[in-house]
Amino acid sequence: MRARSSHPDGLARLKDLMATSVEFYARESQPQIVWQGDLSGQGELEQFRLATVVNVIDLTPHMKRIRLKAPNLERFASFGGLHIRMLFPTASVPNPVWPVRGNNGLVSWPDENRRPPSRVYTIRRLEVAGGHFDVDFLIHEGESVGSNWASAAREGDKVGILGPVGRPLRPADWFVMGADETGLPAVGRMLESLPATTRGIAFIEVADEGERQQIDNLTAVEVKWLYRNGVTGGESTALADAVMSVAWPEQVTGFGWFAAEAAAAKRVRDHWRSDLSLGRDQTIASAYWTRGDAG
């Protein structure tokens, strides 16, 4: 295999994609991958950053926004992914050993016993020039690595990040979006960054009116808030019902984006695939959490 790019981030991205594909499709033979040339051998992992908490604010009673700073954030704006994998210090792993680049070009962990737990979160707002970004955390009961960390986060705390991760958003003239609290940061970012001419409708489900937050919507997408008002998250069908009720316009490029509890995501995905015959190039329906599972 040969990879070539004019920029180190691009080269690292290509090598990562190629090595991942080889490991997946040739997993039975388990070939050894050893790169030569630039960015070869063990060393600093290009997609890793050690981030520092700048400040923590309460957006709503159950949503915190944490601003983090880190060096060289250009790659997080270059590859289209909205998300990052966050590596959290915990009581059981208070001093993590961070990942490095292995000889195969992929993530390598020098000490598995000090490998931190990780979860995927959305970059809510990214300021490359300022060297900082915001991540919104839903604070909730039960065991949750991300929620527990965010609840205790203070200025100066450290956390690792890998990324960006996730499928890039395809350009479209019209969108239908649906999200509960877990997908809300991504919807907010999209509404603040898509072209002003973008049309469509976005449904956002939250616990009650107190959880509604300000979104600087720069598009022509209509935003509708849905309140559970006492219904437990994951039990209401209102969000999926609303998204599935939308008629897609003809003669414009459309895109469907949905992120919520697993059962709701499956309903919407099945509707888009089976009832409307829409493919992966036109839709994303993701399970951001599963009812009954610890986070």
Task: Please annotate each region the language model reported.
Residues 2-295:
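Extended, composition-driven regions rather than compact fold-specific motifs
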